[in-house]
Design a protein with these regions (language model features):
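Short helix-loop hinge/linker segments at domain boundaries
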Residues: 1-10, 30-32, 66-74, 93-96
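Short beta-strand-to-loop elements that line the ligand-binding cleft
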Residues: 37-44, 63-64, 130-141
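Short beta-strand-centered segments that line the small-molecule binding cleft or hinge
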Residues: 24-28, 45-81, 85, 122, ...
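Hydrophobic/proline-rich hinge and linker segments of small-molecule sensing/allosteric domains
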Residues: 72-112, 182-196, 206-212
Length: 228
């Protein structure tokens, strides 16, 4: 019976997923499973993999595929990358973006250590040119990337869920990619030994059910979150 699932459960979440996804499911989960003592920690992917292997984390929400033999992955959703472009930009007039439009030299990036940054770099690899004179900036938050884009310092790419929190005026600066849209795969990951699988199942079911109403994108191409 659902009501009898209980005990401590340690969940890791990567920083680029935590602020948008956690508020969507946390209240529902706690209400439905009051006996589970959920401990949540924001961790990068490397830390998550290590802690799952060491048994210090029961599960995590991360960008996949990670191709790690110790870890099982269950897809929660596919989250498209969305262009956020200032008004004075060469791509401002484009209704939909192509991957070939991207230029790493005018792209504002998250700082090193974020798998979303590695995904963007993998996306830009195809047409990579390097020009040392260009202004380059890396930041720890999407909020800062949005502010700098608003100042005309370049363009950036945002995960779709993050775009839902933008102000109405800022929404006008979003440019979607033509299908199949580049996207990241976000999964619930856990050790292959499947300890606490009942709680993992419960978590997967609740998040999948909630996210279905927010993200309906199916025609996507998955961009690897691993630095190449």
């Amino acid at each position: 019976q659902k009501g009898f699932i209980g005990g401590e459960f340690k969940l890791g979440i990567i920083p680029t997923v935590m602020p948008t996804l956690l508020p969507m499911f946390l209240k529902t989960f706690i209400k439905r499973y009051p006996k589970i003592k959920l401990k949540i920690e924001e961790l990068n992917t490397e830390e998550i993999i290590q802690r799952i292997k060491d048994g210090h984390l029961d599960a995590a929400i991360a960008a996949t595929p990670l191709k790690n033999e110790h870890i099982k992955e269950r897809v929660l959703f596919y989250e498209p990358f969305v262009g956020y472009i200032p008004n004075n930009h060469r791509l401002t007039s484009k209704k939909t973006l192509e991957i070939s439009d991207l230029d790493i030299n005018d792209m504002l990036l998250l700082e090193d250590g974020h798998c979303f940054r590695d995904g963007v770099l993998n996306l830009c690899k195809a047409n990579k040119t390097s020009d040392q004179n260009e202004f380059q900036l890396e930041s720890g938050s999407f909020e800062m990337l949005v502010k700098l884009t608003n100042e005309g310092m370049g363009m950036t790419l945002l995960p779709y869920l993050h775009t839902l929190d933008l102000k109405e005026k800022e929404q006008e600066q979003l440019h979607y990619f033509s299908e199949p849209s580049p996207a990241r795969e976000v999964s619930l990951i856990y050790h292959k030994s499947e300890l606490k699988i009942q709680i993992i199942d419960a978590l997967h079911n609740i998040i999948s059910g909630i996210i279905r109403g927010a993200i309906a994108f199916q025609n996507v191409q998955i961009i690897s979150p691993i630095a190449t």
